Amino acid sequence: MEKQQYIDRAEHALYKVYNRFPVVFDHGEGVKLYDTDGQEYLDFGAGIAVMGLGYSCDKVKNAVKEQMEKLPHISNLFYNEPAIAAGEKLLAVSRMEKVFFTNSGTEAIEGALKIAKRYAYNKGMAPDYEIIAMKHSFHGRSLGALSVTGNDHYQEPFAPLIPNIRFAEFNNLDSVKALFSDKTCAVIMETIQGEGGIYPATEEFIKGVRALCDEHDALLMLDEIQCGMGRSGAMFAWQDYGVKPDVMTTAKALGNGT
């Protein structure tokens, strides 16, 4: 089938969420992709930071094949060994306390926001408690994740969003400090902002935000969905700063496309 035929079929059948490039990929090996015309590409996108182990990795393929032949799915009503082992490994490399599995990065953000809300509820905070997020951030496109994404272009078509989200300037500690109050239950931010460039938190900033959260008994929630799983050099970017979040989200390269 010709490339244009695939594109025509996609335009007819698939909801348009991106302005796609006119390329139809067929398969990949390592860091290279191949389209339906046989053209080879060196892939610097990695499926938007997903394919951390590359394409057609034998260890990944064999692990998926082995598990699919045994048990492809079981609900959270029961235990299963792979989930337990994965949770233990994540705790070992992160030194966090518990693991909550979701289906995607944006769903992980939704889970983090629910943790913040439940935290405020358990503290007996008034219903108008606030969450501080960062301008120029990106946390996902579901309703809650979009509410803490500091970009009017993404937010405006879906207003009204979750209320009581305050936006500070990334790497501007005074901006964050000015928003803190007795209503603040959490701060959510990326350790390295990845929307429109690569902007790491400064050490002064991230340590200062950690101190503000401690002072006000608020949660520090770090989004490592794009920068985590070794992409910064450390397993998680926050580990290079000598701080530890109360909540961390990770995804993308965690699953390598599976």
Set out the residue ranges of the language-model regions.
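Conserved N-terminal phosphate-binding loop of PLP-dependent enzymes in the Aspartate aminotransferase
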Residues: M1-T258
